[in-house]
Amino acid sequence: MKTYKTLKTLLSILTFVLLSNVIAAQTNPDSLTTKLQQAFTTESLPGMYVIMTDGGKITYSHGFGYADVANQVPYSASTIQNIGSVSKTVIAVALMKAIELRYFTLETDINDVLPFKVTNPNDPNGKITIRELTNHTSGIVDNPEIYHYSYHFYPKLRAYDSVSINTLNQMGFGDKLRDTTLAQFFFNYLSPQGQYYSKANFGEGPAGSTSSYCNIGSALVAYLIEIKSGFTYADFTRKYILKPLKMDHSDWHIPDMDLKNHAYLYLDLKNRFPLYDLVTYPDGGLKTSPEDLSKYLMAIARHDKRLLTEASYQAMFTAQFSKEHPPKNINLTYRNKGIFWNLYTNGTIGHDGDDPGIGTFLFFNTTTGKGGLFLTNKYLPNKQAIVDVLVKEAAKK
């Protein structure tokens, strides 16, 4: 009898533990949703979508608010929008694939590839390597007098609000460049014979000595891939990244997209921006959905061999800067740089993105293998509240 009572007690305890685990599993998503809803409301976002992953599966998928506020169209897993500088991680993957194809190496001098010569007037005898483009120490900088004019808006495709246009004008954004290819733009920007050439397109030298985050330098890597591959960068990434991962609702240019699921991009909860592309589209112009982007995230976190070899992943995620001799203007307290990817000191690897009407973040935890992403259709000056929630969730074992 005593044995029976003991067994009964043990079974009761075991049942309680199992039920507790089930309840925890059921309430954790609700707890995460509550925290995200608080941040969503505090930031006055029109719409947002969050996905958490673990290995090859999605463990959390939830939308908040609207892709179209006026018509109350929910922001869903299939909603499409620009992802800003998260696009630079795609350049990283494309670059490593190009290296596997023996087009060049990270140490290749860009003048060994370009059809015109690039010289930093502040370092006339120096050279610029592909590696320095990937970690933003090349000495090429974003001249705001030119870069903000590289956005191409499509006001006739969708309704927009004049308040948003006025805001863009005040911020210096315009639609004044008529370049239609990376080749045209980079000749005009970097060649002394180019239409936009200026000493202001370059920072101090020598290359490798100073960190200056550069969209144009990032897109230059994509142009180098174009030169060696014979493909447009868009076609190269479709072939080696988007199609292998079945990212069927992702692309680079508005005319190539089905706009049915494209979110409106907002200045605030009411005023809408027109849709837009970028002349330097590789640096921030990928349009994708949370569902498609999660396929990419899971592939990267698992070192998926459909994209790259293990050696390429290792190279892509190797820290570029030493603590003893970092370049000027960078603080390694919170992050180092891989090949475009940010290597955060909290044990995660990722990248964020900003542009008019968008905010994004994508990351994975190198210890747990869990990852997360969020997309919102409004510029978010400070993503930290949302990022902290997701990073903490991904750290759980």
Task: Cite the ranges covered by each PLM segment.
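Short active-site loop at a secondary-structure junction
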Residues: Q38-Y49, N71-L133, F202-G217, Y281-G284, ...
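Catalytic-site signature segments of enzymes, centered on catalytic residues
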Residues: P144-L259, T280-S294
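Active-site helix/loop module of the DD-peptidase/beta-lactamase fold
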Residues: N82-V86, E100-R158, Y223, I227-R272
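Acidic-glycine-rich active-site phosphate/pyrophosphate-binding loop
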Residues: G63-N71, Q193-Y196, L265-K270
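N-terminal leader/targeting segments and the immediately adjacent pre-domain N-terminus
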Residues: K2-L7, V17-Y75, Q81, I99-T105, ...
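Catalytic loop of the DD-peptidase/beta-lactamase superfamily, centered on the K-T-G motif
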Residues: Q26-G63, E145-H148, H152-Y154, S209, ...
